[in-house]
């Protein structure tokens, strides 16, 4: 379906935004995939931006807040997710200035440790390192969490 119909594109865009927030780029891609032309999409994106319904900064903040609450992740994973959704690098940098990934790493580690109680200390440490690394936390943050949770063998000099 190829459609230059801006009102149709606006209706579809509002439907998508009613489900959840989107970045400008993400919404553009979905409208293009639906079959609307680039010429029909551009005015819709501009109008939604002027109305405040489409704001990459607010969208990025919402992603970070949601991720922090639901499934704590490190900076690396947050950056990758925001890039994938089309948020500009300048906005990502600005949003991450206040991001406390060390505290989130500690919280994620504490929660995960509850499911690792039956394992040996060495296995717990290894599993926790892999888990936190997969969540996008950096090595220093992981080691800090291991030290805080008093896991023997969490040595700064040993790589993961």
Swiss-Prot record:
Disulfide bonds: none
InterPro entries in the cross-refs: RecX_HTH_1st, RecX_HTH_2nd, RecX_HTH_3rd, Regulatory_RecX, WH-like_DNA-bd_sf
GO BP, sorted A to Z: regulation of DNA repair
Keyword set includes Cytoplasm: yes
Entry GO CC: cytoplasm
Keywords: Cytoplasm
Any matching Pfam family: RecX_HTH3
Subcellular localization: Cytoplasm
Top-level taxonomic group: Bacteria
Similarity field: Belongs to the RecX family.
Purpose: Modulates RecA activity.
Family matches, as HAMAP family: RecX
Protein name per Swiss-Prot or TrEMBL: Regulatory protein RecX
The organism of origin for this protein: Pelodictyon phaeoclathratiforme (strain DSM 5477 / BU-1)
